[in-house]
Amino acid sequence: MSQPCPCGSADEYSLCCGRIVSGERVAPDPSHLMRSRYCAFVMKDADYLIKSWHPTCNAAAFRDDIIAGFANTRWLGLTIFEHTWSEAENTGYVSFIARFSEQGKTGAIIERSRFIKENGQWYYIDGTRPQLGRNDPCPCGSGKKFKKCCGQ
């Protein structure tokens, strides 16, 4: 039975991010890497998350923390609202909202992730989280205030 890709593309997982997570295909840009990393969180694939972090981040040292985070978190959806990259500079940025539920409470991660490309491979480096006031417009583009949208 086919399974829809958790990234929200409407494609089957095996034809979408599953090909990147399995290593069959390399992420062609930071947006695809971000989507595949989100899928790895959904599928609880610590190995792929560690592999897709830049080696200087030493993500393997946090394997136990990554796995522990899987226990109580259910991922509800990913919205990418901005992505830019420069092949010439081998850098890219993806701004997203990842919704989740943890111990009965919903939440959202809003981040601008930074990526670097080395030897034909994109890697996640780190991210920054914007400081949003409750009355600010929601960055997802809904037109609602943050407090009535992703900030709930």
From Swiss-Prot:
Coiled coil region boundaries? none
Identify the InterPro entries for this entry.
Answer: NTF2-like_dom_sf, SEC_C_motif, UPF0225, YchJ-like_M
SUPFAM superfamilies tied to this protein: NTF2-like, Sec-C motif
A Pfam family assignment: SEC-C
The record's comment on protein family reads: Belongs to the UPF0225 family.
Protein name, as recorded: UPF0225 protein YchJ
Species, as recorded: Salmonella paratyphi A (strain AKU_12601)
